[in-house]
UniProtKB/Swiss-Prot annotation:
Keywords annotated in UniProt: Ribonucleoprotein, Ribosomal protein
Name of the featured protein: Small ribosomal subunit protein bS16
Gene: rpsP
One Pfam family hit: Ribosomal_S16
Gene3D superfamilies on file: 3.30.1320.10
InterPro entries per record: Ribosomal_bS16, Ribosomal_bS16_CS, Ribosomal_bS16_dom_sf
Record-level Gene Ontology MF annotations: structural constituent of ribosome
GO cellular component: a single term: small ribosomal subunit
GO biological process per UniProt: translation
Family (UniProt): Belongs to the bacterial ribosomal protein bS16 family.
Segments for region (Disordered): 81-115
Length: 115
C-alpha cells in the first residue's frame, strides 16, 4: 500500500477548503483516507495563521513510515520545516533570435527612426 500525504477538497462551490490527509494513493481525491493531519484554507490571506494548519507530530510519524507528500503538500512541509524544501529545475533560457530576424528588426527600427 503506497501512502500519500495529499489535499482532499472540501468546502462549498467557489469556496475551496482542503484537508491535508494521509491516504492510499489508489483511493479517490476526496475518498477514503487514513488520518487527517492538517488543513489548508486558500481563501484566507497569505499571512493569516490559520491558512495552513499542520499536526507536526503525526506528519513526522507518517513521513518516517514511508508516506510521500504530493508537490503542493511538500511545499507546505518545506515551509514549515518538517521536510526539506523541494527543488525545482530552472526554466531554460529563451534562445536569441537568428541573424535574419535581427537584421529585420534592425531595419524596422531604422525605418521607424527615419520616419
Amino acid at each position: 500500500m503506497s501512502l500519500k500525504i495529499r489535499l482532499a477538497r472540501a468546502g462549498a462551490k467557489k469556496r475551496p477548503y482542503y484537508h491535508i490527509v494521509v491516504a492510499d494513493s489508489r483511493s479517490p481525491r476526496d475518498g477514503r483516507f487514513i488520518e487527517k493531519v492538517g488543513s489548508y484554507n486558500p481563501m484566507l490571506p497569505a499571512d493569516h495563521a490559520d491558512r495552513i494548519r499542520l499536526v507536526d507530530e503525526r506528519i513526522k510519524h507518517w513521513l518516517s513510515n514511508g508516506a510521500l507528500a504530493t508537490d503542493r503538500v511538500a511545499r507546505f512541509l518545506g515551509n514549515a520545516g518538517l521536510a526539506p524544501k523541494p527543488t525545482y529545475n530552472e526554466q531554460p533560457k529563451k534562445s536569441a533570435p537568428k541573424a535574419k530576424a535581427q537584421e529585420r528588426a534592425k531595419a524596422a527600427a531604422d525605418a521607424a527612426a527615419a520616419a
